[in-house]
Amino acid sequence: MWSGIPIFALLSSIGIAAAETGLDGWLRYASVPCNGNCQRALPSHIVTLNSTRSSPVYVAGQELQDGLHQILGKHASVKSTGCSTDSSIIVGTVEAYRQVCNAGRQVPQFDVDGFWLSIREKSVLIVGQSERGALYGAYEYLSMLAQGNFSQVSYATSPHAPIRWVNQWDNMDGSIERGYGGPSIFFKDGVIRQDLSRVQQYARLLASVRINGIIVNNVNANASLLMPSNMDGLARIADIFRPYGIRVGISLNFASPSTLGNLSTYDPFDSSVIAWWGNVTDQLYARIPDMAGYLVKANSEGQPGPTTYNRTLADGANMFARALKPYGGVVMFRAFVYDHHISEDNWYNDRANAAVDFFKPLDGKFDDNVVVQIKYGPIDFQVREPASPLFANLYKTNTAIELQVTQEYLGQQSHLVYLPPLWQTILGFDLRVDQKPSLVRDIISGQRFDRPLGGWAAVVNVGTNSTWLGSHLAMSNLYAYGRLAWEPTLDSEDIVQDWIRLTFGLDRRIVDTLTQMSMESWPAYENYSGNLGIQTLTDILYTHYGPNPASQDGNGWGQWTRADHLSIGMDRTVKNGTKFSGQYPAEVAAMYENIETTPDNLLLWFHHVNYTQRLHSGKTVIQHFYDAHYTGAETAQTFVSQWESLRERIDAERYQHVLTRLIYQAGHSIVWRDAINNFYHNLSGIADEKQRVGHHPWRVEAEDMQLDGYVPYAVSPFETASNYTAIVTASNGTTGTASATLDFKTGTYDLGINYYDMYGGKSHWTVYLNDRVVGQWQGNSEDVLSHTPSIYLDGHSATRITFRDVKIHKGDRLKIVGKPDGVEPAPLDYVVVLPPGIVD
């Protein structure tokens, strides 16, 4: 019951708020109109059935008091005694409610962490099975008010699964692996930060969407976290999270007994190793009595693990589980285990097989407080993957799904990509174990196989940026993750509409516009990045950001496409290929084994086919590639105009922040489109039926302009430059000029310039028409955008700037002057002169 029809949602405009940084996220508690009658209908008192400041019930009272005041201008008193329901909000646990209030009223049934919310006129009851649940109920009530929803309700709700955690990949030096929102809020210079004020703000956000656990450090863990002084720092962090019902856990380095403890081994069967980990665990729980447990990445991507000593992964996990058992702690053991040195020359090699190969033989051998944490797909957070078959192969083992809020392969928060529709393709997938309904969401909850533990983990990676993730719009994914972890059957569109109202207000125009943009964003990104199950065609060897399809193949990482002159795709059939399809239960395996029953959107995941293979749509594979990439880029262009239509409805600071990123995405989507299409056009030799690929009548190639101080440069990968060539200044101390006479009909155009914005320099460019300045800009995207920068001319650094509504006469002289800086040689790719309504 998160949604309702907000009373004020039909207002055309609520007015523009003061500038906002985004720090409050969806907990802005922005003012909602509330007249005298409205004020009189609100409770005047808040009764918290616990006065201990570290109690989530106490926090609930403070949140309710602040929220009522900020949202509705209502001043409500807070007390911890009495139980009058007259014009009061009573918040507490079931036990406290029955004891203190001597309540004869029947309380509905709900599970641990669940709550009951009852709103009757001016009487509000918020009763949790635990103190954490009571806090969740308080946030639920405030969410309703903040959305203008004053409905009278009475319902109980319980979580889908007991584990609802977030993972942070924060390093001890303060950097964050795959983090795009600034440095760590936890660590700096090898120790825990002294200033942990952002941690409390993060705790509020997480608790408001019912997250109950956090791993604060990188899975590629540094053993120094286990030094006594850092354990003390972890206790400080845990003290901040505790009042919000969030338990803290840590990632461990398997070799810590050797690297930190000076033991000669880290064999999980060695008594000295077992004792060492037992002592570490004792020390941690002495400081953090409610510690959640450990997250372990072992024998993966160079990380140490038990197989070094011919022990199984279960042996390693159980060593930690037994140290945690007396304290009620949990081991989250990652299933992301594979060999990244396999040879593509062997047709039957397949990284996708690894999880089942490693873990299926161990089913039933993990202790009951071990949870195997499984990425949603068999590879690595790709734009589309089938559900991991490991979910269907662990009957006697607790499992959790691992999602990724941080957009490692999906635009790194510089592209708008709303992820829940992607996640729902996995959560709602029926694996048909034993020919019975076996939805992934029911497996991870423990319901399908009657397991005591299970749930959710998401790699989030917030940082010190005021937007938390590097983009205001990316916060919709964190919000939605919490919502889905509580109730995975929720509709993705309903969730984002709630987030929009809480983040940007009740203006119906804002809600409708952002809903459309959000729901179109993942399909658009899939279209211009990678289609038909081929994976995200990004540079897997470098930044995981821009296009580089060749990087998928010819190495041991196993994200292969097996693309050649005639054909493309992985043959994962049992009959001819890697036998991956056979890892699924029979009904699903049969669907994927047969090319006729394999969905088009996963065709190239399961089958190696000619480029001329016909899809169910009737198109060939290669023509689908061409069309989809154009369609996706065209959709991305519309995000700019849609957002601009909200200019007078959103505060200037957030408006400009989002606009900058959407303009960038519009340009970078064209970089993606052209790179992928040019690569496969060059590889296959098959022309685009619509004659778009390689044909750009509105472009002026930089290398074809008159150059002074600039020289041509062969870009690598070749497809990330129009006509495979850019221009750079002859030296880093030389100003370059590129000039051309424009042969376009007189009219008003958008003047676009594609260039490269490299890390390590901030070049400056000025554009002239007939010696009149049209505009200028600086290559400073590393200061503005969140994605991993590049030191090369490539698909990561390629970008576009557009000057709109430029009056151009046929025969005008265009001149671009570039001044290099640092290692950046003011590189240019091409100029495009676009008539109204044309997407280059």
UniProtKB/Swiss-Prot annotation:
One of its GO terms (cellular component) is extracellular region. The keyword Signal applies. It catalyses: an alpha-D-glucuronoside + H2O = D-glucuronate + an alcohol. Keywords: Carbohydrate metabolism, Glycoprotein, Glycosidase, Hydrolase, Polysaccharide degradation, Secreted, Signal, Xylan degradation. Its EC number is 3.2.1.139. Glycans are attached at N50, N149, N222, N262, N279, N310, N465, N527, N576, N610, N682, N723, N732. It comes from the Eukaryota. It is an enzyme of class 3 (hydrolase). GO terms for biological process: xylan catabolic process. It holds the Pfam family Glyco_hydro_67C. It is found in: Secreted. Belongs to the glycosyl hydrolase 67 family. PANTHER family: ALPHA-GLUCURONIDASE A (PTHR39207:SF1). Alpha-glucuronidase involved in the hydrolysis of xylan, a major structural heterogeneous polysaccharide found in plant biomass representing the second most abundant polysaccharide in the biosphere, after cellulose. Releases 4-O-methylglucuronic acid from xylan. This is Probable alpha-glucuronidase A.
